[in-house]
Curated annotation (Swiss-Prot):
Molecular-function annotations in GO: 3'-5' RNA helicase activity; ATP binding; ATP hydrolysis activity; ATP-dependent activity, acting on RNA; RNA binding
Gene name for this UniProt entry: PRP16
Biased composition (Acidic residues): 168-180
Chain location of the short sequence motif DEAH box per the record: 473-476
Keyword field contains Hydrolase: yes
Misc. remarks from the entry: Present with 1250 molecules/cell in log phase SD medium.
Main location: nucleus
Domain Helicase C-terminal: 540-735
Disulfide-linked positions: none
Phylogenetic lineage: Eukaryota, Fungi, Dikarya, Ascomycota, Saccharomycotina
Record family assignment: Belongs to the DEAD box helicase family. DEAH subfamily. PRP16 sub-subfamily.
Region (Disordered): 132-180, 1035-1071
Protein name per Swiss-Prot or TrEMBL: Pre-mRNA-splicing factor ATP-dependent RNA helicase PRP16
Length: 1071
């Protein structure tokens, strides 16, 4: 077998063993293993398993691979020896744009560059040859211009249109999440910031393994970094008597003072049994998760889907039946338009109708009113109509705006109000969310928006002059944007006395809102609630899912179906699905013993219905259907059913006492979704669901002592448990106060989160050493993106890769791109792997979008390759929005072609503070904090044989472990260039560079050590850059001290404290 044939056979064998790519580094390692004389077949197989994931254990294949590697090693060793400069080992990648939907599989997106022929040179010094080999110039292919530009008008999908059942099965998470950024700011941008202009054009740096092993990065000690804090933060810390260590974050800092300034602990009593059970989670859920993994492994080994045997077994028919059932659901949910009389009758039955005149009178007499009303009182849909009828929208072209914390609420309420007013949606009544503006600037009088949209509108008009009345709905949810809006209006109302502000809330937080606005009057809409009996458990339950299932079965067996429906509160989707499955199993056991029932579908008096945000809208609709007492609905819901939904017929509530809360740790920059105890206010809201239509009963799966001692009075506001960098950048650009610390927060954020967010903005160049916005920061605030994403986009503009960066930033702004259906997880994993770009998840996302664009944005292509169609559509919308901003400034959008190192360095410029360094074979450690982290299993780097030494990541998430998500390999010199205040760099001397010892112990250095090579030059350049930043910090600090001294002297003169009779100077102490 020839040399080329042997190499092809090795690659074929490797493809049979694993789906991962055979990289040159991994191939070299395998050759070295095969060369060892004492390596037998078992040892070789074990070594291969340690290096990468394998899908086969066939010893025959491994034996063939071992022999081929031995022969290849011998051939390489007997070949002619040539001395030549090292070629560039970095792989060049090319996005494949010629894929066709008719092809069964994707071509590999990674194209290996053919090795150029080596040139013979004369023999030189061994050390000099090694240096030449390590630092030879990078061989670059010519970069063509952009192959394809994004068009505003997108190609229509000609080959396939999704059915309605497919559309409703798409992920609904985007519509149910908060709107953080809002719509496009059409204000024209000023010139490109000076910081972006002055950035050096990024040149490729050869990320050769030898170079990376020659230098090492280390975190700069905390004590040293504390000396490099910008003066405005040091001054703030000094004035507030807080340690400067909280500004930069330290996981080793455990003092009581620092703990009081850090994030709010989501557990009021962390040592209680109730809190411990929350941290452990449900055993039943964990057991189900393990069983599902075992079932999936069995399916993977014996899969018959889409085969002749699969058709015999009916697998394909089951999928078709599922589609039919989905279609049936869609038919059941067909919308109807009620008559005018029906609408009038429904509106008059609402509790708010009976107090209409008193409510409007109170609004006329006061600038701010707090309205308290339970879910179902009609405050959300009726209040805006009452104000419209009173003429608040007729004044000089002004309109009424209503904010909602969720997109789906803004859309649904706008549709309902338009139907009740019998006007077309988008005319008199409209809504505006990100990427959807269904309004008419001339005739829209009632506008429903997300709180993020209204917050972004303040950038265009800081007086909101076009609105006569603002309604902040569902304010008790205390979303971050709602809290910022409340602080903004507290400042604005003093300037606009004609503006009316109405805050609607459930009973929780109403007093706080009133006190915040100077004891504004409160108005309570009389409810129609009935008494609810609350029953606690006598002892703490060990498994809340098991206890909830048991209680639901008891209620159903002890009470007739006509007595009412059951609502079970759970923490999230996994808990809900486990409860759903376990309820079916338990009821089947009972009914099989009593009636001989063979399967759950034969039980005709129970309907179990889940409800959570990611569930398709048509399935969510089923919980509102009236079953007329023939069946009992058992609804399993998250806290979305506390206030956002009104479900008729609920008479029994089962409350597990927990919910999932997203918590941010500023010490390590970690977002984590944790199960925590609910608040007392949440518990009362849940219990109240049982008394909306008749007297009810609430079963609390915790003791009364737990309610009193382990639960906070109110839910922790989002502003006290989230990163504030984007919010603070927005407030800086609004310039509402001289200092951000003086902004009127209704609940102040933790001081550590506040200061660490400001430090992050300074670190990435958004604010200067005096705390003011830089030109770059001013431009960053114009983009509806997180600050780091805004920066990498602006840096990419200067470095000629803005076309690719537009796509990457857009893809990072949407939910999960890939999906794994339970019945086809192995197929989904294989399809996802084909998109992988080695050592970069960011470039993998770019690859996915480019492949989709090459296939005319086809939904059929997405379904075929297990890609979320709706996520890609959202990414395309975001990309168009950002492209419009760039084009309005006449900034060219340029492609870097094949040169992807430029893109990676631009990514590093915004995420240098989020870097990790490899330790051991497969683990990473956070380079700044020292926390051990792992690659997320969905990463393109996960399972690689040779992992890169340094990476940057987009997100750090904690589930069962600390995972870094969306990772890209970077050069250590890039990290030094953009993170020089966090890291130090050192050169590791090899054997030839080590000193030698003479006969009498004297040391002699190698003469070539004195010659400065490229690595030494780059190290010195990085340190010089850091020294210049430190010098600037010192100069600013000294200037501030001098200004303060002059100001004090001037004040003393004005106060008459300085006169000619000066006392003798005191002798300065010696210490």
């Amino acid at each position: 077998m020839g040399h080329s044939g042997r190499e092809e056979r090795i690659k074929d064998i490797f493809k049979e063993l694993t789906s991962k790519e055979l990289t040159p580094g991994l191939l070299l390692t395998l050759q070295k293993l095969a060369q060892k004389p004492n390596t037998n077949l078992e040892q070789f197989i074990a070594s291969c398993k340690a290096l990468t994931k394998l899908s086969s254990n066939n010893p025959i294949i491994f034996n063939e691979l071992l022999e081929l590697l031995k022969n290849k090693s011998e051939e390489d060793s007997t070949g002619p020896k040539k001395i030549a400069p090292s070629i560039n080992k970095r792989k060049k990648f090319k996005i494949q744009l010629d894929l066709d939907d008719n092809e069964d599989e994707l071509d590999s997106p990674v194209q290996k560059k053919p090795a150029p022929t080596r040139t013979l040179f004369k023999r030189i010094d061994k050390l000099k040859a090694k240096q030449l080999r390590q630092y030879s110039p990078t061989v670059k292919d010519p970069s063509p211009n952009s192959e394809q530009q994004t068009q505003n008008g997108h190609a229509e999908t000609k080959d396939y249109e999704p059915t309605r059942s497919e559309v409703v099965e798409e992920d609904r998470e985007w519509y149910d999440n908060d709107d953080d950024y809002g719509n496009l700011v059409p204000e024209p941008l000023s010139e490109l910031p000076e910081e972006a202009k002055l950035l050096p054009v990024i040149r490729n740096i050869d990320n050769d393994d030898a170079l990376r092993n020659t230098v090492q990065l280390y975190p700069i000690p905390l004590k040293q970094r504390m000396e490099w804090i910008p003066p405005f933060l040091s001054k703030f810390a000094l004035e507030n008597k807080v340690p400067t260590s909280i500004i930069i974050g330290s996981i080793s800092e455990t003092s009581s003072q620092v703990s009081a300034l850090s994030m709010v602990n989501p557990f009021r009593n962390p040592d209680s049994e109730f809190s411990a059970n929350a941290k452990r989670g449900s055993k039943l859920v964990a057991l189900r998760r393990i069983n599902m993994e075992h079932i999936q492994q069995s399916r993977d080994n014996t899969t018959v889907l889409n085969t002749a045997m699969g058709e015999v077994l009916g697998l394909e028919n089951n999928n078709k039946a599922k589609d039919k059932s989905n279609q049936k659901i869609c038919d059941d949910t067909a919308l109807f338009t009620p008559s005018k009389d029906d609408i009038k009758h429904t509106k008059e039955q609402l509790p708010v109708f009976r107090c209409r005149s008193q409510l409007l009178s109170l609004i006329r007499e006061n600038q701010v009113v707090v309205i308290i009303g339970e879910t179902g009182s009609g405050k959300t849909t009726q209040l805006a109509q009452y104000l419209y009828e009173e003429g608040y929208a007729n004044d000089r072209g002004k309109s009424i705006v209503v904010t909602q914390p969720r997109r789906v609420a803004a859309i649904s309420v706008a549709k309902r109000v338009a139907m009740e007013m019998q006007v077309p949606l988008g005319k008199e009544v409209g809504y505006s969310i990100r990427f959807e503006d269904v309004t008419d600037s001339e005739c829209t009088k009632l506008k429903f928006v997300t709180d993020g949209i209204l917050l972004r509108e303040t950038l265009l008009d800081d007086t909101l002059d076009k609105y006569s009345c603002v309604i902040i709905d569902e304010a008790h949810e205390r979303s971050l944007n709602t809290d910022i809006l409340l602080g903004f209006f507290k400042i604005l109302l003093a300037r606009r006395r004609d503006l009316k502000l109405i805050i609607t809330s459930a009973t929780m937080n109403a007093k706080k809102f009133s006190a915040f606005f100077g004891n504004a009057p409160q108005f309570t809409i009389p409810g129609r609630t009935f008494p609810v009996q609350t029953i606690y458990t006598s002892n703490p339950v060990q498994d809340y899912v098991e206890a909830a299932v048991s209680q639901a079965v008891k209620i159903h067996l002890a009470n007739d179906c006509s007595s009412g429906d059951i609502l079970i509160f759970m923490t999230g989707q996994e808990d809900i699905e486990t409860t759903f499955d376990t309820l079916q199993e338990k009821f089947l056991q009972v009914y099989s013993k009593k009636f001989g029932t063979a399967n759950f579908e034969e039980i005709n008096d129970i309907e179990i219905l889940p409800i959570y945000s990611a569930l398709p809208a048509d399935l969510q609709f089923k919980i509102f259907q009236d079953l007329h007492g023939t069946k009992r609905k058992i609804i399993i819901a998250t806290n979305i059913a506390e206030t956002s939904l009104t479900i008729k017929g609920i008479r029994y509530v089962i409350d597990c006492g927990y919910s999932k809360l997203k918590v941010y740790n500023p010490k390590i920059g970690l977002d984590s979704l944790v199960i925590t105890p609910i608040s007392k206010a949440n518990a009362d809201q849940r219990s109240g669901r049982a008394g909306r239509t008749a007297p009810g009963t609430a079963y609390r799966l915790y003791t009364e002592d737990t309610f009193k001692e382990d639960m906070y009075l109110q839910t922790i506001p989002e502003i006290q448990r989230t990163n504030l960098s984007n919010t603070l950048l927005l407030l800086k650009s609004l310039d509402v106060t001289d200092e951000l610390s003086k902004f009127p927060f209704i609940d102040k954020p933790p001081l550590q989160t506040f200061l660490s967010s400001l430090y992050e903005l300074w670190f990435i160049g958004a604010i200067d050493t005096s705390g003011q916005l830089t030109p770059l920061g001013l431009q960053m605030a114009k983009f509806p993106l997180q600050p780091s994403l805004s920066k990498i986009l602006l840096i990419a503009v200067r470095n000629g890769c803005s076309d690719e960066m537009l796509t990457i930033v857009s893809m990072l702004s949407v939910p999960q791109v890939f999906y794994r259906p339970k019945e086809r997880q192995k197929e989904a994993d294989i399809a996802r792997n084909k998109f992988f770009i080695a050592k970069s998840d960011h470039l993998t996302l770019l690859n996915v979008f480019e492949q989709w664009r090459a296939n005319n944005f086809s939904s059929h292509w997405c379904n075929k390759h297990f890609v979320q169609y709706k996520s890609l559509v959202r990414a395309r919308d975001i990309r168009d929005q950002l492209l419009t901003i760039l084009k309005s400034q006449k900034i060219p959008v340029i492609s870097s072609g094949k040169d992807w190192d430029i893109i990676k360095k631009c990514i590093c410029s915004g995420f240098a503070h989020q870097a990790a360094k490899i330790t051991g074979l497969r683990n990473y450690v956070h380079l700044k904090t020292g926390v051990s982290v792992q690659l997320h299993p969905t990463s393109a780097l996960h399972g690689l044989g040779d992992l890169p030494p340094y990476v940057v990541y987009h997100e750090l998430l904690m589930t069962s472990k600390e995972y870094i998500c969306c990772v890209t390999s970077v050069d250590p010199f890039w990290l030094m260039e953009y993170g020089g205040l966090l890291y130090d760099i050192k050169r590791i001397k090899n054997d030839q560079e080590a000193t030698t010892t003479g006969l009498f112990g004297e040391h002699y250095e190698h003469t070539l050590d004195k010659v400065e090579d490229d690595i030494d030059i780059n190290i010195r350049r990085c340190k010089d850059m850091r020294d210049s930043v430190i010098q600037e910090l010192k100069m600013t600090d000294n200037s501030n001290k001098e200004d303060k001294k002059q100001k004090t002297k001037k004040q003393n003169i004005l106060n008459g404290k300085e006169n000619s009779m000066k006392p003798f100077k005191r002798r300065k102490p010696f210490f």
